[in-house]
Amino acid sequence: MPKTILRLPGVKAESGLSRSTIYLRINQGLWTKPISLGGRTVGWPAHEIAALNAARIAGKTDVEVQSLVRKLEMERKQVAV
């Protein structure tokens, strides 16, 4: 299964959130941290954005979303092995 990486404009389009809100949520633990694509370029795995959107649509609490964020970021490390 191919892993698509979304740059910030794609993440904004998929989530409906502004840049400042995305980075605020990262600081609150409610959004996954971006991955480095080299230089100053960052992106997010598309499946993570889909999972975060699904959690919000399902009405998950902030605590549940924070747990999901930790799980998604841990999965990144397992995929790399």
Locate the predicted segments by residue.
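Residue-level signal for alpha-helical context at structural boundaries
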Residues: 29, 40, 67-71
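A short, Lys/Arg-enriched interface patch at domain edges and termini
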Residues: 50-78
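Polyanion-binding surface elements
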Residues: 1-28, 51-58
